[in-house]
């Protein structure tokens, strides 16, 4: 008999496989900044099917298209600065010209200045990925394969069900 639970299991398995492939592609393309997007990817099953969703506020498409220029969130340079600290990226030191006490060390001042410059460039022109035309190697290449695999598995399940229900070789139903 045709089992809807089996179809949902197939969908859940394929969506989990899709999630794993997207994560592998993100790592292979060096598209992991903080790891929050990877942690937020999850498979959600409903009564009608399922979906792969991200809890991040940023649109998921930015992973392939990049961020266009325009308005940036408040504190964007602080976000970039934190990313720089997390990944060990540092600017060339800009020495102070006075000997008075300063709020930041020379390195921290240089890093904050670099983060502000990067934020300004992204706000004005967009990210480098956006300026170079984006890519299609994170999820665009694996979604069609996943849809095809789901179709093939569900179709196989349906054809097995139909084979059970339809008499073969002109045999009558009920054994007559």
Roles of regions detected by a PLM:
Residues 1-51:
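Charge-rich, low-complexity N-terminal segments
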Residues 36-176:
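Charged, low-complexity interaction tracts
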């Amino acid at each position: 008999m045709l089992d809807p639970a089996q179809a949902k299991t197939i969908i859940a398995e394929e969506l989990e496989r899709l999630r794993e492939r997207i994560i592998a592609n993100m790592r292979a393309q060096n598209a992991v900044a903080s790891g929050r997007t990877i942690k937020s990817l999850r498979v959600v099953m409903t009564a009608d099917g399922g979906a792969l969703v991200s809890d991040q506020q940023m649109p998921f498409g930015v992973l392939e298209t990049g961020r266009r220029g325009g308005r940036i969130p408040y504190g964007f340079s602080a976000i970039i600065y934190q990313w720089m600290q997390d990944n060990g990226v540092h600017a060339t030191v800009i020495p102070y010209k006075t000997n008075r006490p300063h709020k930041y060390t020379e390195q921290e001042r240089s890093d904050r200045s670099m983060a502000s410059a990067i934020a300004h460039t992204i706000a004005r022109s967009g990210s480098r990925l956006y300026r170079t035309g984006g890519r299609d190697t994170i999820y665009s290449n694996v979604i069609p394969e996943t849809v095809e695999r789901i179709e093939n598995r569900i179709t196989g399940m349906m054809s097995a069900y139909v084979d059970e229900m339809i008499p073969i070789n002109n045999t009558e139903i009920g054994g007559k």
